[in-house]
Design a protein with these regions (language model features):
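Sequence/structural segment immediately N-terminal to covalent heme-attachment motifs in c-type
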Residues: 12-18, 49, 69-88, 188-213, ...
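Electrostatic cytochrome c docking/interface patches
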Residues: 58-78, 167-200, 290-299
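Structural preference for beta-rich elements and adjacent junctions enriched in aromatics
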Residues: 289-531
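Extracytoplasmic electron-transfer domains, predominantly the class I c-type cytochrome c fold
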Residues: 1-53, 100-160, 221-284, 435-439
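Extended surface/linker regions that mediate inter-domain or inter-protein docking
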Residues: 52, 145-198, 210, 282, ...
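Short, solvent-exposed loop/turn and secondary-structure capping segments
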Residues: 61-64, 88, 95-99, 142-145, ...
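Short acidic/polar inter-strand loop motif in beta-rich domains
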Residues: 56-59, 164, 287-289, 510-514
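Aromatic- and Gly/Pro-enriched helix-to-coil junctions and flexible linker segments
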Residues: 51-56, 63, 78, 82, ...
Length: 531
């Protein structure tokens, strides 16, 4: 939005109608994921969108003028203009956009929000509500509204409180908020990490899994998309945390819990501050110190001899790991608005005869069909602490078998000498070659595609890709190999050293009913085979 105000609205209309794919080549359209909307939206709808974009961008850059004092009336006006589309006019979370949100918008009539400075189940403070409005909720459809005038945000706090009877009752009874205090984080130590690991395995791994990837056995009971019960947070990706990923943020989340979710509070009556800090210290070891940066090109180092299919082999430990972000496919129905798999890591190597990719990605829901073919390590049932044990032990649940398999496809252009194909599985003039692995068969199948709707499986003589797969504690790992040169050059990528090779990825989460066009996709990246 920083640059949109410097462009004429006619330019924006053109971009929306034509998308990235329809723009002239000099604008590098193949690097744009922007779909063309000329066949989906009317001209009138596009101009309404443009009006909204320019008005919103203008608000971000406008200098604040004189503001009226915060009021209920102003709060209602701003709420109906900005918030009711998701939260509904009455605040019940049933606005027209609710079906396109995951998790669904907060039911404000209940008086609860996830991120508070108060204890689990208690109403938030005015400051908590103001912060939620200002900052939004990271990785959800709830945006931050810091561009709104401060008094408008304060007015929203007043109006939001009017939607629930709990705030008025709280005031009439003369109650005051009990704020959770967070002290200075103590230094980590070997002893603290050992204590934290023991506490985590007993108290947290049932939901978050032993590696923190959200694959704990309790998810079979608490996760249900149809009821809006979402997966436990993937603790190995702290850049996705709603509140933040500082040690103080983690401490506060543990002490307050997340109201209306399965994440409980860790009460001071049961857990001392020292124990909470021990858990925090251990949790920080489950993730890299910062979000990995995109690495392109993906370097395939030249090695001698056979390329190992052992995931722990030195060749893979020494190879450069490239972080590849993924997003939901949104151009063609069925669309993937909220994909589970948001990124993957890839390494590469070649030996002048074969090229191999080692790919791993987090998926908290194992497809149990893979157990027939490959090594699988699932997070075990943790030993329950005494205060949580019931009179009768719970019967373990059988893992549900999803209707669709988990899958991944690696995509290349068929020809390196022609214009790069459209990143969404090519186009009519520029086909792509795909290697698709699936848990259903544990095989890689080669396809050619001329777009999302035009895939064709190659015949058996062309199926020469080899794979090895495993699943360990919420993460799939795959080694996929093929010869550099094969005989079917009209339908298969022919690898060359010392030149850029476009590469892209598609991922399907079968538990989330992803199949066909409903999937995560990457844009084009570059693979480089060292000479």
């Amino acid at each position: 939005l920083d640059s949109i105000l410097s462009r004429p609205q006619a330019y924006t209309f053109w971009r929306i109608m034509k998308g990235g794919k329809g723009l002239p080549e000099k604008y590098e359209p193949w690097n744009s994921a922007m779909p063309a909307w000329e066949d989906s939206l009317s001209k009138e709808d596009v101009w309404k969108i443009i009006t909204y974009i320019y008005e919103t961008a203008g608000q971000w850059h406008a200098k604040p003028g004189k503001q009226d004092p915060p009021s209920l009336e102003r709060g209602k006006q701003v709420y109906l203009e900005k918030c009711a589309y998701c939260h509904g006019e009455g605040g019940k979370g049933d606005g027209p956009s609710a079906d396109y949100s995951m998790p669904q918008p907060r039911n404000l009539t209940k008086g609860h929000i996830k991120l508070r400075s108060t204890s689990f189940g208690k109403i938030p403070t005015d400051k908590d509500l103001f912060n939620a409005i200002t900052k939004g909720m990271q990785n959800t459809t709830m945006p931050g509204w810091k561009h709104l005038p401060k008094n408008d945000r304060k007015s929203l706090v007043i109006f939001v409180k009017s939607l629930s009877k709990k705030f008025e009752k709280f005031k009439k009874r003369g109650k005051s908020h009990k704020i959770i205090k967070v002290g200075k984080p103590p230094a980590s130590s070997k002893e603290s990490l050992e204590r934290g690991k023991e506490l985590f395995m007993v108290q947290c791994s049932g939901c978050h899994g032993v590696k923190g990837r959200g694959d704990g056995v309790a998810t079979q009971r608490v996760v249900d998309y149809s009821s809006n019960a979402i997966w436990p947070r993937n603790l190995s990706q702290p850049w996705t945390f709603r509140r933040g990923n500082s040690k103080k943020d983690l401490f506060k989340t543990l002490r307050t819990g997340l109201s209306t979710t399965a994440m409980p509070k860790f009460s001071p009556r049961v857990f001392k501050d020292e124990q909470i800090w021990d858990i925090v210290n251990f949790v920080t070891t489950l993730a890299p110190p910062a979000q990995p940066k995109m690495q392109s090109p993906i370097h395939a180092k030249k090695v001698e001899g056979e390329i190992s299919e052992d995931f722990n082999a030195p060749i893979w430990k020494q190879a450069q790991a490239s972080f590849i972000p993924l997003g939901g496919q949104l151009q063609t129905k069925p669309k993937s608005y909220f994909p589970t798999v948001r990124n993957l890591m890839v390494r590469a190597a070649h030996n002048s005869k074969e090229v191999a990719l080692y790919i791993h990605w987090d998926d908290p829901s194992l497809d149990p069909k893979l157990k027939k073919f490959s090594a699988v390590e699932e997070s075990p049932q943790p030993p329950l602490p005494e205060h949580l044990k019931g009179h009768e032990p719970e019967e373990p649940l059988e893992a549900a078998t999803p209707e669709f398999p988990d899958s991944i496809a690696v995509q290349f252009p068929v020809s390196l000498d022609k214009q790069k194909p459209y990143f969404l599985n090519g186009d009519a003039e520029h086909p792509v070659n795909l290697w698709k692995w699936s848990t259903a068969t544990n095989n890689a199948v080669e396809f050619n595609a001329h777009g999302l709707e035009n895939w064709k499986k190659q015949d058996e003589l062309s199926q020469v890709v080899k794979v090895k797969a495993s699943y360990e504690y919420g993460q799939y790992s795959l080694i996929i190999k093929r010869k550099l040169k094969v005989i079917h050059e009209k339908i298969d990528i022919q690898f060359q050293t010392g030149r850029p090779i476009p590469i892209a990825f598609n991922v399907w989460d079968g538990y989330h009913e992803e199949t066909g066009n409903k999937k995560s996709t990457s844009s084009w990246f570059t693979l480089w085979l060292d000479e």
